[in-house]
């Protein structure tokens, strides 16, 4: 893996690689990847690197292979040897930004603090109601000035997480029910028998590569897994 990484660094040439979600440059390669790697590619593009290296986006991650799927570079970064630009990081940020611009925000709990940031200070979170660090994050987000926060509930931890998520979503005031539990420790007790987006949220989380909570996303395409204090959130919003 280290040798392949060094070869990539030495051989890559400067190029601008466009990012298009759900683009499959080779259906044959997609079938090979799905069989060998047990993941369904959401996007495959042919790059100008190394005589035809393919970039694959699946499960919220990028990796690389050739047209036959004979070898894979997973968990590393593709570095442009001329400019030393991290192609993988740039591509991931651009792709995440595109995906975030088309999120089904109606499936999230919406919080508007102050003037909401005028559309320029938006945070997307994925949270489980029984996640301790999610509760800590919520207490920070309550105090985030002039911003809009969209929270997608993804009950990952237990059956009780699913029950709480349903009750919060079915509450007359979802944000109030969420804060009552996450900030004040007052568990939701109302009905859980209403249509909810929880299954869709889980599929969305999988598509974005969210495998733990909390997870934060910013309009820039920046992705932060785990808890963040308020001051660091502010820095990413500037």
Describe the function of each predicted region.
Residues 168-170:
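Conserved NTP-binding/hydrolysis module of P-loop NTPases
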Residues 219, 225-226:
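Short, exposed beta-strand-loop hairpins at the edges of beta-sheets
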Residues 2-10:
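Sec-dependent signal peptide recognition
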